[in-house]
């Protein structure tokens, strides 16, 4: 079965991360599938909204480290960057149902969602610094904007996780429900959107995001440049080696 499932029904495209045995860690092939699904949904006038979902126990553990190291994103045409451009510029409403851990891009993609519904077991983290890297998905801009600088610093500089209640308080999450209800709630809200005039949805979203579109695009490029450079530096090499060897990284001599 595919690691990415797509289903279009009654004006809603649902994209499901379907690699639970690997904690929904995302491979380049999965990014490519999601990027293509967004391209098709953007062009399809019958699609009024998109929902991202995982499993009741896990949203995503972030990048699949082994796959990532074997096929490091080297250009802005890499699948991960095509996906990020696709979700950040998507003109129609994007929703997410998030339960369990949402690590790295599992959290940063949510900054590009219009409505996020979390299970009460959701836990969010952006541990890029812990891996000797820097933020991606324009999260270095969007996290301080959404969370406030202090909380963003805890999340990005310290890499500290935060739970659903904190995410609700800072506005990253729209509502918290039991994990068994999150996907259904996201679908109900998406169906409400699908019943509304598409032109009004698109124009309202455009106006709400007016002023940040170019900044987000520029920041993604800047982050990608830094990310690519840092991947080749000693801190990242130590972090990934430690991960593969199942030990804590030692940055004391770097």
Put a short name on every predicted segment:
Residues 214-219, 253:
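Short beta-strand->loop
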Residues 1-55, 85:
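Conserved CoA-thioester-binding segment of acyl-CoA-metabolizing enzymes
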Residues 205-214:
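Short, charged, surface-exposed hinge/linker loops at domain edges
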Residues 32, 39, 46, 54-89, ...:
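Glycine- (often His-adjacent) and acidic-residue-rich active-site loop
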Residues 29, 33, 79, 86, ...:
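Charged catalytic carboxylate motif
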Residues 88-201, 228, 233, 238-241, ...:
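Crotonase-fold acyl-CoA enzyme core
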Residues 15, 19, 34, 52, ...:
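Terminal peptide-recognition signature
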């Amino acid at each position: 079965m595919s690691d990415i499932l797509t289903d279009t029904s009654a004006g809603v495209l649902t994209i499901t991360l379907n690699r639970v045995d690997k904690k929904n860690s995302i491979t380049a092939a999965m990014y490519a599938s999601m990027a293509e699904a967004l391209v098709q949904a953007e062009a399809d006038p019958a699609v009024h909204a998109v929902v991202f979902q995982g499993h009741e126990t896990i949203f995503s553990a972030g990048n699949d480290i082994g796959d990532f190291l074997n096929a490091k994103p080297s250009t802005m045409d890499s699948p991960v960057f095509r996906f990020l451009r696709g979700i950040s510029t998507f003109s129609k409403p994007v929703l997410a149902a998030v339960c369990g851990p949402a690590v790295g891009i599992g959290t940063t993609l949510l900054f590009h969602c219009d409505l996020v519904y979390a299970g009460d077991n959701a836990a969010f983290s952006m541990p890029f610094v812990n891996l000797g890297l820097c933020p991606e998905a324009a999260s270095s801009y969007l996290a301080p904007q959404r969370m406030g600088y202090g909380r963003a610093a805890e999340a990005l500089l310290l890499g500290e996780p935060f739970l659903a209640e904190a995410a609700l308080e800072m506005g990253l999450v729209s509502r918290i429900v039991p994990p068994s209800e999150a996907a259904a709630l996201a679908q109900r809200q998406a169906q409400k959107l699908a019943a509304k005039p598409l032109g009004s949805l698109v124009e309202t979203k455009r106006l709400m995001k007016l002023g940040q579109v170019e900044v987000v695009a520029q920041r993604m490029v800047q982050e990608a440049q830094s990310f690519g450079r840092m991947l080749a530096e000693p801190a990242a090499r130590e972090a990934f080696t430690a991960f593969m060897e199942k030990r804590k990284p030692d940055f004391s001599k770097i």
